[in-house]
Amino acid sequence: MKNKTIYYWSPFLTEIATVKAVINSAYSLRKMSEDFEVTILDAAGEFKKKTSEILQKKINLLKLSNIDYINFLPKHGKILSRLSFFLIFICSFFPLKKVIKNKQPDFIIIHLITSLPLIIFYFFNLKTKCILRISGYPKMNWLRLFFWRIVLKKVYLITCPTKGTYNYLKELDIVNENKLKVLYDPIINVNEILKEKNKQSLKFEKNYAIAIGRFTEQKNFEFLINAFKSVVKEIPNLDLIIVGKGEQKKLLIKTIRKNQLEDKVKILEYQKNIFPFLKNAKCFILPSLWEDPGFVLLEAAFMRCLIISSDCQNGPKEIVEDKNAGLMFNSNNLNDFLEKIIEFKNLDNSDIKKYKLNALKACRPFTIFTHGKNLKNILQ
């Protein structure tokens, strides 16, 4: 029997959680069955640093350009990053169309810069089936709504990372309901985490809470730093470590100084292995304005790190609130956040164990194995 060929399309400027999801998804199919031949498309050289990992996992990597022009594109700022995405769109249009037409993969799963393959599939009659993967919470404006109403007619399926996003798209009524599927992201690689969790290059003697993510408006770390001035009054022996990188780094440092928290709040550059930090933290705080589902939230849950999360759409509500897997505060609400901090301070061991166990159970749908099994069923 002929192997099914699956292509992944997900160009990116900076390494975000979606990149990990793409590689893990491709890997999950390879692990699930040898009947799948899986290829990641490299539009501009963005996957170059991931080549060894991709090949080690027996995933093919197909370059669409001989030049790694990703190195010359601006990566931060709304206007400059959108300009970079536009350039990738223009430079990849004909190479992507040619590859799909000539190679004729059975499926192409599209994660980022999805407008390009959506337009190609709308205007050209191709044998390949296109699956749109919703990566992150879809913010709808009239232009995207209009665009999706037109181009989604040619899409084979749309997979949603949470039930909340599934229900949201269903209510919008922009596509046949039969095309919508819930497919949880492959966030938890159990074997990999077990290997990495004890490898720690930095050690902290003090008790600390931890927050992890890109330094962007979405992650809302400025709110957390401002709030931590009050947290210190409630729990004087608790420090805060924020791990990540991004365009708001200078703003966050300025906010720390403004609140005179230099001795209590530390910023660490992006860490490839965050599991030891989660393992030793007293709690994980997620102050985000939106997440779908929230990769690091699930990694914290798997590491048995007590979760204090905002109630932002969509993932945290489904993971933390619905599963009783931690403490949840009203997003961007200082008073409610401080109430949850006081509740955290007064938790007894039985409550802590209950939250941690529920959080661990909530991780099950997000393992590589579960994702691979469910994606295999979708493709067959």
What is the predicted role of each segment?
Residues 322-334, 343-349:
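Conserved acidic donor-binding segment of nucleotide-sugar-dependent glycosyltransferases
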Residues 16-24, 207, 211-233, 240, ...:
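A conserved mid-protein helix/loop that constitutes part of the nucleotide-sugar donor-binding site
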Residues 155-180, 187:
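A short, active-site helix/loop in glycosyltransferases that binds the activated sugar's phosphate group
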Residues 336, 350-365:
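A short, well-ordered alpha-helix in the C-terminal region of glycosyltransferases
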Residues 306-310:
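Short hydrophobic beta-strand element within catalytic cores of glycosyltransferases
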Residues 8-16, 28, 32-83, 179, ...:
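N-terminal strand-loop element at the rim of the active site
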Residues 270, 289:
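Aromatic "clamp/platform" in nucleotide-sugar-dependent glycosyltransferases that forms part
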Residues 88-92, 110-116, 134:
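Short His-centered aromatic/hydrophobic patch
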